[in-house]
Design a protein with these regions (language model features):
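Membrane-helix boundary/interfacial segments in multi-pass membrane proteins
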Residues: 60-70, 189, 193-196, 216-233, ...
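Periplasmic/ER-lumenal interhelical loops and adjacent helix-loop junctions
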Residues: 169-253
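Membrane-interface coil-to-helix junctions
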Residues: 1-29, 52-62, 66-72, 194, ...
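Transmembrane alpha-helices and membrane-interface helical segments
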Residues: 30-38, 77-85, 124-132, 241-252, ...
């Protein structure tokens, strides 16, 4: 839409494209900082660190060659709307406004980049399943609250569904015929672009800090030996980021379990929703890693390929690693 507006005013097509991409990057950086600082109440320093991990990562630099993937900069806006939906849940007017804004922003992401929309849906489904499992272990029956909301506000829920269907009809009218003709990939083609364990650290030979290590490991040599699309695998994380993530996994898990068992003994339920969401997000990131990783062609991504709608059209599934910079930035 911004590109079309610029072109309508006579801006050169290449300049219009560059302006939109730069604007996306700036907007993504600012909205991520706003999300971390204002919504998640993270300190200014760690909010800045989160922005760097998300918007100035090695993976972002590598993937900007595929300009559609810069739609990842829209994800913080989507999360802000979803967070605000729950934040103002008791206010009918604000809840409904943010509900429709959430649906609209996701639909716009679909129109901009199918990869980004698919990975967003996949992660949110993973997070929802993990969150329900964690909440159940806390004796916190979240589904009862969801069902109570649906029963009380069923007209609102129906309105969301109808609006969501209507707004994406043009997308699917265009996408489904093309997908049937050209989009479906064989699993054998996809698995060649799934990361091995070492690729979660593969920041490419062009990385100024760790590029020499990647070059020594000769990871690009797998193009000849295994037929792998090695240029798609350069979306790993730095040792510092991965180290922080692993540390926070154990630190947060220990803190969560201590508080959980104490609450279960005293109250019979652990109802700290903030901690439940945080630990669920950490678990979801590692579940996503497990789904992605492959060894000698064997990968749990096969279940995603078989069960998740639209998955056969995702040729370079390793790009999910790039999307995971969003939850990792929030966690760290």
């Amino acid at each position: 839409i911004p590109y079309s507006i610029l072109r309508a005013f006579g801006v050169n097509m290449f300049l219009a494209n560059k302006i939109v991409l730069i604007a996306f990057h700036i907007m993504g950086s600012y909205t991520m900082y706003y999300l971390l600082r204002r919504k998640f109440k993270i300190s200014s320093l760690w909010s800045f660190v989160g922005v760097v991990i998300f918007s100035y990562s090695s993976a972002y630099y590598v993937r900007i060659g595929h300009t559609q993937l810069m739609a990842i900069s829209l994800i913080p806006v989507l999360i802000i709307f979803i967070y605000s939906f729950f934040e103002y849940f008791e206010s009918n007017k604000k809840r409904i406004i943010y509900g429709f804004l959430s649906i609209t922003s996701y639909a716009l992401i679909m129109y901009t980049s199918w990869y980004t929309a698919f990975f967003t849906a996949l992660f949110f489904v993973t997070l929802a399943i993990v969150y329900l499992a964690v909440a159940y272990s806390n004796k916190n029956h979240v589904l009862k609250n969801v069902w109570a909301y649906v029963k009380k506000c069923w007209k609102e829920v129906v309105a969301y569904v109808v609006y969501a269907v209507c707004i994406v009809i043009p997308f699917f009218m265009l996408y489904i015929p093309v997908s049937r003709r050209f989009g479906e990939r064989s699993y054998g083609e996809i698995v060649q672009q799934l990361p091995e364990l070492i690729d979660f650290f593969n920041v490419s030979t062009g990385n100024r800090m760790l590029g020499w290590v990647i070059e020594k490991l000769d990871l690009n040599g797998r193009a000849e030996t295994n037929g792998m699309f090695v240029w798609e695998l350069h979306v790993g994380f730095s040792i510092i980021v991965m180290g922080l993530l692993v540390f926070l996994f154990f630190y947060t898990r220990r803190k969560y379990l201590k508080a959980k068992y104490g609450a279960l003994e005293s109250k019979g339920v652990y109802d700290n929703n903030d901690m439940t969401l945080r630990i669920s997000m950490i678990y979801s990131v590692f579940v996503s890693f497990i789904l992605l990783v492959q060894s000698n062609g064997a990968s749990l991504w096969l279940f995603v390929y078989k069960l998740f709608p639209g998955a056969p059209a995702i040729r370079a599934a390793v790009r999910y690693n790039f999307f995971l910079t969003v939850p990792i930035a929030i966690i760290i």
